[in-house]
């Protein structure tokens, strides 16, 4: 995708209704799309790094479905997880995406195997994780690249392991960095209630 092209996702963002709030050092932005679905994002007010992204679709009967966490830690209370049958063993691998300004990054906790156990590859527009002992398999979807119609490049994929956590990183293409910079410029122009805007110029 060239920087001059406009993707369907960019058009969707442009046409969405949005509100912004500066609170507790975070810039909170809420989008409502034409199909009734929603997206909620939170950014660090100083660094402008994305801290959280959640999405929610509208049900066929018009009711709102549960929020799906795309970036950040899930904040579903443990009691609620038990009630809706989502509670898993505390020893099961847990995936969370924690991005940086120049990387997409995933942390997969409760993976005790040494680093030479893991094999990562790019398959069908996903990052695929396998272990040589065949005890773990996972596909990671890079939604930001899909929305901007960009391909994954195996050369930009790295990983490390420490404290029973596998850390998978993918360097953001320049097209993504430019998109995020332009988006933040627009978000800073939204009328926000709350704290004084401290976001650094990108």
Regions found by a protein language model. Give the residues of each.
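N-terminal low-complexity tails
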Residues: 1-106, 171-202
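Charged, surface-exposed interaction regions in soluble eukaryotic proteins
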Residues: 95-178
């Amino acid at each position: 995708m060239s920087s001059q092209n406009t993707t369907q996702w960019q058009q969707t963002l442009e046409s969405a209704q949005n509100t912004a709030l500066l609170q507790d050092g975070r810039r909170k932005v809420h989008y409502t799309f034409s199909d009734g679905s929603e997206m909620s994002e939170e950014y660090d007010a100083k660094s402008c790094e994305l801290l959280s992204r959640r999405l929610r679709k509208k049900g066929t009967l018009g009711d709102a479905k549960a929020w799906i966490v795309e970036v950040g830690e899930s904040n579903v209370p443990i009691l609620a997880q038990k009630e809706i049958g989502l509670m898993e063993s505390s020893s099961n691998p847990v995936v969370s995406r924690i991005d940086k300004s120049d990387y997409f990054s995933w942390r997969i906790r409760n993976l005790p195997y040494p680093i030479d156990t893991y094999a990562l590859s790019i398959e069908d527009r996903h990052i695929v994780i396998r272990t040589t002992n065949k005890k773990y398999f996972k596909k990671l979807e890079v939604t930001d690249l899909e929305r901007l119609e960009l391909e994954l490049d195996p050369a930009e994929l790295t990983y490390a392991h420490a404290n029973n956590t596998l850390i998978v990183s993918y360097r953001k293409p320049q097209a993504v960095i430019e998109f995020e910079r332009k988006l933040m410029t627009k978000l800073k122009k939204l009328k926000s209630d709350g704290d004084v805007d401290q976001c650094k110029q990108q």
